[in-house]
């Protein structure tokens, strides 16, 4: 089973991706991980990627697609795979299609943006230990203070409201069009991946069961 999981940052894709991969015994494939591994292994594509990264450039779609095609030929992908954070653009989706990479399911986790902002901007962290809290859903015993050490909690830069809104804006402009792309393809062609949307609001188990229902 070959799966693409879509959804905005903070929608809970990571948790659901782990659930899917465990249930179906398939690997979670991240382009970031692929790049790091290719660079470390000095593969031809890794060498090309490193040249671009060393000067602060953006990795081309050709390199990304090449890495993806290499990765899905490995033994652990024989039962399928789950793409995490890929494709990000229509160009990448078209390249997958052109190169004959079969996708069975595209699952979109939908969460209202204001809910995501509340989720992410409410996070607080104790950096030394890695403990995390939430001002609403999992508050510390004393506001702003770690339960164990009594030290101050901080809000990570990535969780600041302005940062979250900026990331959501990028997602809306760049990745959200993929939803329309896969919906349109499915409506026109029976061989297209099956697209389904899942409401990402609720308990982790509720969202998990909705995702499984789409895949079944």
Curated annotation (Swiss-Prot):
CDD domains listed in its UniProt record: ADK
Pathway: Purine metabolism; AMP biosynthesis via salvage pathway; AMP from ADP: step 1/1
Pfam families the UniProt entry points to: ADK (PF00406), ADK_lid (PF05191)
Any one GO molecular-function label of the UniProt entry: adenylate kinase activity
PROSITE patterns with a match to the protein in the record: ADENYLATE_KINASE
GO-annotated biological processes: AMP salvage
GO cellular component terms, semicolon-separated: cytoplasm
Description of its domains: Consists of three domains, a large central CORE domain and two small peripheral domains, NMPbind and LID, which undergo movements during catalysis. The LID domain closes over the site of phosphoryl transfer upon ATP binding. Assembling and dissambling the active center during each catalytic cycle provides an effective means to prevent ATP hydrolysis.
The family this protein is said to belong to: Belongs to the adenylate kinase family.
PANTHER family membership: NUCLEOTIDE KINASE
Stated role: Catalyzes the reversible transfer of the terminal phosphate group between ATP and AMP. Plays an important role in cellular energy homeostasis and in adenine nucleotide metabolism.
Protein name: Adenylate kinase
The organism of origin for this protein: Ruthia magnifica subsp. Calyptogena magnifica
């Amino acid at each position: 089973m070959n799966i693409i999981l879509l959804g905005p940052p903070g929608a809970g894709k990571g948790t659901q991706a782990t659930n899917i991969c465990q249930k179906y015994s398939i690997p979670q494939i991240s382009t970031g991980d692929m790049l790091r591994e290719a660079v470390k292994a000095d593969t031809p594509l890794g060498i090309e990627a490193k040249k671009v990264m060393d000067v602060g450039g953006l990795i081309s779609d050709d390199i990304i697609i090449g890495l993806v095609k290499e990765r899905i030929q490995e033994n652990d992908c024989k039962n399928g795979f789950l793409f995490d954070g890929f494709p990000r653009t229509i160009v990448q989706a078209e390249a997958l299609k052109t190169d004959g990479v079969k996708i069975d399911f595209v699952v979109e986790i939908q969460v209202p943006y204001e809910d995501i902002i509340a989720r992410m901007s409410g996070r607080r962290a104790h950096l030394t230990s890695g403990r995390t809290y939430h001002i609403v859903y999992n508050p510390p015993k004393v506001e702003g203070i770690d339960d164990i050490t009594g030290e101050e909690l901080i809000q990570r830069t990535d969780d600041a409201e302005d940062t979250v809104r900026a990331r959501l804006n990028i997602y809306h402009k760049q990745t959200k069009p993929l939803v329309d792309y896969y919906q349109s393809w499915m409506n026109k062609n029976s061989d297209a991946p099956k697209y389904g949307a899942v409401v990402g609001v609720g308990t982790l188990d509720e969202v998990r069961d909705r995702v499984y229902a789409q895949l079944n």
